[in-house]
């Protein structure tokens, strides 16, 4: 996924 569930920012 493009978004990390912990930080909610694009990886």
From Swiss-Prot:
Keywords: Chloroplast, Plastid, Thylakoid. Its main location: plastid. GO terms for cellular component: chloroplast thylakoid lumen. The keyword Plastid applies. It is found in: Plastid, Chloroplast thylakoid lumen. This is Thylakoid lumenal 33.6 kDa protein. It comes from Spinacia oleracea. The lineage of its organism: Eukaryota, Viridiplantae, Streptophyta, Embryophyta, Tracheophyta.
